[in-house]
């Protein structure tokens, strides 16, 4: 949502980073089917899109609100037998697959590499220290994802550096339809349980020593995460309460030197 995105950008700027920021805006109306067995809303619910329209210095917005860059309906149509039981409220919206495809597209749009930050994240330190070109990526690995039947490890997408030139050279991928959450019908397939960042991690492991990663076991102490900002888009009151509680990470003190804030806004 735009409020979370703006706060994320402001938190990055507050930590002294004046690097260019790219926001890939996938905002779109979301239809949540009526739940069964007490799961989900009683009636079909439509969450209206709320695009990020704020104009901020040093921030570029890639508008995909109408599928101009990635047509997700067309993408999902390639997998007519995709699993419909691995998602939220017993009906998958394939948010993970869309997320994965988006990051893979960013490899084309930002071929020199980038630091990936999720829009519902607030950073607590200068993230430019993650940019280390001797590594294929710098980030945090989640080994035991809750609810993952096969415990497939992954690189958390909340905050990580990806060295796109190195990764591309060695044939690593962020998206592989054989290893992507819910794109196959059979829930017993291990490949169906690869969440965002899992495919890339496996490729990096399989190409050692060509690709070496820098792991930050305590990287989660460098940021706080709202969790699920993309699919809780209708819960604006909850989001605002979370931002109010954590405003120290992005709000400028009243007596601060204005030069500290060169820009504002961000997220990928």
Regions found by a protein language model. Name each.
Residues 168-248:
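Catalytic core and acceptor-binding pocket of nucleotide-sugar-dependent glycosyltransferases
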Residues 1-10:
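N-proximal low-complexity "stem/linker" segments adjacent to membrane-targeting elements
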Residues 20-22, 60:
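A structural signal for isolated positions on well-ordered beta-strands in alpha/beta enzyme cores
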Residues 92-94, 121-202:
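Conserved catalytic core of nucleotide-sugar-dependent glycosyltransferases
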Residues 111-122:
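Short beta-strand-to-loop acidic/aromatic patch adjacent to the donor-nucleotide binding site
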Residues 29-110:
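Active-site-proximal specificity loops/subdomain of glycosyltransferases
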Residues 25-27:
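Acidic ATP/Mg2+-coordinating residue in the GHKL
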Residues 10-19:
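Short, acidic, metal-binding catalytic loop of nucleotide-sugar glycosyltransferases
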């Amino acid at each position: 949502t735009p409020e979370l995105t703006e706060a994320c950008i402001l938190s990055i700027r507050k930590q002294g980073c004046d690097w260019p920021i790219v926001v890939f805006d996938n905002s779109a109306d979301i239809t949540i089917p009526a739940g069964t067995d007490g799961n989900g809303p009683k009636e079909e619910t439509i969450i209206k899109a709320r695009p990020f329209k704020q104009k901020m210095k040093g921030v570029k917005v890639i508008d995909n609100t109408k599928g101009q860059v990635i047509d997700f309906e067309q993408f999902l149509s390639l997998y007519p037998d995709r699993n419909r039981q691995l998602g939220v409220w017993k009906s998958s919206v394939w948010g993970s697959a869309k997320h994965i495809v988006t990051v893979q597209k960013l490899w084309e749009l930002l071929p020199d590499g980038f630091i990936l930050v999720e829009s519902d994240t607030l950073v607590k330190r200068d993230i430019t220290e993650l940019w280390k070109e001797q590594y294929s990526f710098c980030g945090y690995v989640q080994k035991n994802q809750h609810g993952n039947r096969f415990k497939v490890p992954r690189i958390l997408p909340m905050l990580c550096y990806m060295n796109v030139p190195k990764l591309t050279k060695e044939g690593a991928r962020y998206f592989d339809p054989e290893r992507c959450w819910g794109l196959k019908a059979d829930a017993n397939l291990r490949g169906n349980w690869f969440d965002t960042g899992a495919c890339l991690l496996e490729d990096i492991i399989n190409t050692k020593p060509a690709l070496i990663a820098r792991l930050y076991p305590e990287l989660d102490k460098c940021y706080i995460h709202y969790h699920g900002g993309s699919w809780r888009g209708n819960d604006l009151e909850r989001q605002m309460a979370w931002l109010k509680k954590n405003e120290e990470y992005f709000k400028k003190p009243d007596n601060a030197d204005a030069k500290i804030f060169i820009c504002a806004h961000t997220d990928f």
